[in-house]
Amino acid sequence: MSYVFINDSSQTSVPLLQACIDGDLSFARRLLETGCDPNIRDHRGRTGLHLAAARGNVDICRFLHKFGADLLATDYQGNTALHLCGHVDTIQFLVSNGLKIDICNHNGSTPLVLAKRRGVNKDAIRLLEGLEEQEVKGFNRGAHSKLEAMQMAESESAMESHSLLNPNLQNSEGVLSSFRSTWQEFVEDLGFWRVLLLLVVIALLSLGIAYYVSGVLPFSASQLELVH
């Protein structure tokens, strides 16, 4: 057997729980279909899901889940169904439906710790170990992502504070932004070619004024000789 019962009895006065112990799928199904409470407990606080999982009755676990059994239910020791099972298919079913592999009971024991203590088969142990390792890696990735997000937020906050503490920087950014907006509106209103023609005319007028004032034609041969 790949499981060890924990101070268990093979008899109970509750029909559904007895069906879960015996692995009687058809009887359990009839009881559930006639309205039996899927979360009914025994004197140790264990539900049918606990008892079916402990014996590897995964089909009964599925039916209990289908009829509303609480997968997160714990017994009076804080054990989930996953703490009591030692079968690969039952472990896979419970984990795939939301049970956490690293959840601890009232004594701080995880399903893996109890499985090793009970001496379940090696395949179940390896599965639990692999699932715990995945959980740890996922937690580390999540923590790293949160740390990066916090660092980015702090950096943005520092930049904003620097901008607020430096009014000259803030004013210059505002002036540049205003100038860009005004220039874009100006170009859109006149049209690109008209603006280009206007700039050419302004440039020619500037050259004419320079010649009138200095008497020297800009970019003339004499100016180039002086430069050399």
Curated annotation (Swiss-Prot):
GO CC annotations on file: membrane
Annotated InterPro entries: Ankyrin_rpt (IPR002110), Ankyrin_rpt-contain_sf (IPR036770)
ANK repeats: from-to residues: 11-40, 44-73, 77-103, 107-138
Stretches that traverse the bilayer: 195-215
SUPFAM superfamilies xref list: Ankyrin repeat (SSF48403)
Subcellular location: Membrane
Membrane topology classification: Single-pass membrane protein
Alphabetical UniProt keywords: ANK repeat, Membrane, Repeat, Transmembrane, Transmembrane helix
Protein name per Swiss-Prot or TrEMBL: Ankyrin repeat domain-containing protein 46
Species, as recorded: Danio rerio
